[in-house]
Amino acid sequence: MRLLLWWVLVLSLFLDPLRAVEEHETDAVDLFLIFNQINQLNQVIETYKKNPERSAEISLYNTQKNDLIKSLTSKVLNERDKIGIDINQNLKEQEKIKKRLSKSIKGDDFYTFMKDRLSLDILLIDETLYRFIDKIRSSIDIFSEQKDVESISDAFLLRLGQFKLYTFPKNLGNVKMHELEQMFSDYELRLNTYTEVLRYIKNHPKEVLPKNLIMEVNMDFVLNKISKVLPFTAHSLQVSKIALALMILALLLGLRKLITWLLALLLDRIFEIMQRNKKMHVNVQSSIVSPVSVFLALFSCDVALDIFYYPNASPPKVSMWVGAVYIMLLAWLVIALFKGYGEALVTNVATKSTHNFRKEVINLILKVVYFLIFIVALLGVLKQLGFNVSAIIASLGIGGLAVALAVKDVLANFFASVILLLDNSFSQGDWIVCGEVEGTVVEMGLRRTTIRAFDNALLSVPNSELAGKPIRNWSRRKVGRRIKMEIGLTYSSSQSALQLCVKDIKEMLENHPKIANGADSALQNASDYRYMFKKDIVSIDDFLGYKNNLFVFLDQFADSSINILVYCFSKTVVWEEWLEVKEDVMLKIMGIVEKHHLSFAFPSQSLYVESLPEVSLKEGAKI
């Protein structure tokens, strides 16, 4: 991101050749001055709390103070802004006071002793503040997490909590007492102010962490250079922000294919699986283009929002929702990468194992991994949105049991719908048979699935019933709808004629353009590169729905015929087209039967009479 912003800076300088390049830096902010401003506001607020007439103004000063704290928090990590505390001078002053305290006795001159003691404590809390900011700047970078900021804040809050609160004897003079009380008031106010700011940083660590590396770049300088290039005078800062955001958006989207290619190349080098297969590399690259493109678009919008709100942080709700979308996009990208490389990796492990390795285990591993990715992403989104994930999981205990008993059937249907979705048993528009139910799936809901029967009746089937019974899905066929028939020929057929008839029928089917053969297999026709790995896990033909068996044999001596079995599959699975193919096959079989002078047999019965009695006919004729 820093390189992108510097690229924009160079572009803006290139577009302004008539101007000499001037090193322009905005005045650095003194963080200690901001602390003092917050301290002064706290002093005013404490004063107004004692005056009921001014209490209405407290909210206004609180708003100003909160704005200053937010601004200060956003600048803590920016090393261009001075801390504002001369730590060397501070340490020298501490040494001087410590020497005086070591020589003085509290009982001899209480006023001088307490004055030095308070001065030393003020220097110590200033040093603590300096050490805190220095620790943040040296320890926090773009890879740091919220817990890192929280742990540093906790450590320095503990140090501030160790400073003492003092009480003064009443035998001091009014002037000295007033002076000590004033010093103590300043000391206490400063201690409370520092504590308040550190607690805010601890509770809002996101505002300290680098956001898209914008905190690392001189945004004032970049926006200033852009405003000089643009021909606008009014609202130049806002226009510069919009221009910078649009340039970053266009640049990131323009680089998406390059970034995708580099990511795929990096993964190839890591896994060393697909380096020799250029087609697979292209397919994997195309599968991750969509999530990477959406991620870059969201990232660009996120950067644009940071620029719009600069120098303040983006609203917490915006950051919350953007973070949730980031998690979902990350899950999408991980699933896409796992489908490309994960299956190949697992398959390679399986093929290198012994022959006793069960292929079902690989399928189970793949499904479990997909499910875990989904669950982790879901929990991450819930946590990002502010839900207490631990409480949600705990609530699934006793309370969940009571609810489950009350709505057992509803939950059964709901979880059945989840199982059906995960199993992918059918989709909308599929022709299925489940028990006595047959028809086309219209819609699958959380409780029931609606099916349109072939008599046009609408059936509503509970999901639990579908999940608990075998489902026959006729639509999950790519190539191959069965044609099976028995061809009965008369017993008067000769052996040679039958053999030639069987041979010709088989040759006709093998050469038929619409009958499936050995070339119609999944590996020959499937374009998805992943199936080359799945062939070692499952039968790809059965997995995708390819059937190309072809059998023609003399099958049976029936009561009235000699039967020839014809068993084959049409290439099409569409009913009407299948009927046309079947009709064509039957007509060609009839031609082959006629060619060999054979006859179709039909159910018949022969009656043999050994002798007949004489029968008298008209006019005395005899037989």
From Swiss-Prot:
Entry keyword annotation includes Repressor: no
Gene Ontology biological-process annotations: transmembrane transport
Organism name: Helicobacter pylori (strain J99 / ATCC 700824) (Campylobacter pylori J99)
SUPFAM superfamilies the UniProt entry points to: Mechanosensitive channel protein MscS (YggB), C-terminal domain, Mechanosensitive channel protein MscS (YggB), transmembrane region, Sm-like ribonucleoproteins
A cellular component term, taken from the record's GO annotations: plasma membrane
Family: Belongs to the MscS (TC 1.A.23) family.
Bilayer-spanning residue ranges: 242-262, 288-308, 318-338, 361-381, 387-407
Protein name: Uncharacterized MscS family protein jhp_0969
Keyword Plastid (UniProt): no
Location(s) in or outside the cell: Cell membrane
Database matches in Pfam families: MS_channel_1st, MS_channel_2nd, MS_channel_3rd
Record key words, sorted: Cell membrane, Membrane, Transmembrane, Transmembrane helix
Membrane topology recorded in Swiss-Prot or TrEMBL: Multi-pass membrane protein
InterPro entries: LSM_dom_sf, MS_channel_1st, MS_channel_C, MscS_beta-dom_sf, MscS_channel_2nd, MscS_channel_C_sf, MscS_channel_CS, MscS_channel_TM-2
Origin superkingdom: Bacteria
